[in-house]
Amino acid sequence: MTTYRELLARRDEFAIYSPEWKEIGDLIDAYVRAQILAGHMEFANMIVSDLGDIAEYGAYENDPELKKEYDGYIEWFRKWNFNEYADELESFIEQ
């Protein structure tokens, strides 16, 4: 959990769509998915909470990159039978 938060804390050092931020984002994504697959569901809850907060502010409709990431997590949660998390993410964008 600390690694996830430490990496997120560095995001202000980079432009959001810079190659450097993409590399950090890819590390975060791989780390989080590995933690979820290992059974650390607090990471799934964090992802749903973080993405849900962003979606509630309209970013899902207005930011194609975020939409891609968001939809990717829905698909990934379904692939690994974490349907309750996919359902929760979908509920944020249906509101």
Identify the role of each PLM range:
Residues 1-32:
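Short terminal alpha-helical segments
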Residues 22-89:
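Acidic, low-complexity, intrinsically disordered interaction modules
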Residues 91-95:
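Short acidic DE-rich linear segments
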